[in-house]
Amino acid sequence: MTNDVIGLLVSYLYAGGLLIIGEVLHRYAHVPNDITRKIVHVGAGMWVFGVLSFFGSWQIGVIPFASFIGLNYFFYRVKLFRGIDSDNASLGTVYFAISITLLSIALWRPAGPIDHAPALVAGIMAMTWGDALAALIGKHYGTHRYTINGGTRSYEGSAVMFVVSLVVIFLTLTLLPGSSLTPYADIPTTTAVIVASIAGAAVATVVEALSPHGTDNLTVPICVTLVALLAG
């Protein structure tokens, strides 16, 4: 089998395993829904590195995330997995799959001549880790709250969003370009990485606060990716 075929098989096994883990933790270990949902969210976002590892063709590599646009919507509608879709859940899982798919189609070129995957991965990591930790810390430890566009958040959560986004953007743009995962990506200057990290984190924090009903899963990755591209 080619790496692309193996990548497809492993991707769906990985995704299925994530869903099962989230469901088992919720149903049998009584882990709260908001935590199991974020565990699955982080696991899904981190699989972008698995995609970069396995696939040599972006046309095939986008299939797993693209297919989960429809699958996540189905899961959301029928509430098949209570570990990720509670009664008050948003379409965030659908939006996240859409943003990753669109960014991959537009920017990921594993065979060259120029691959912009580091920028899109920076956007995905900001959403993967920044949003997850901001939501959890904001919910459980946030005491200073504000409401925008019908969504209530905390200043503590937004601060976490900024700091975590800054760290993951910096690490992504420092370590990924020119590596074995993205050999055709241009290596940015240190100044460009610092600018992208600070500006990207600021944009991620503001956009996350302004985006209602799970749409931050769409807006944050796209906006941070654009910042990374402009800074680089």
What kind of feature is each model-predicted range?
Residues 62-66:
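Hydrophobic alpha-helical transmembrane segments in multi-pass integral membrane proteins
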Residues 2-11, 19-61, 72-230:
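Interhelical loop and helix-boundary elements at the membrane-water interface
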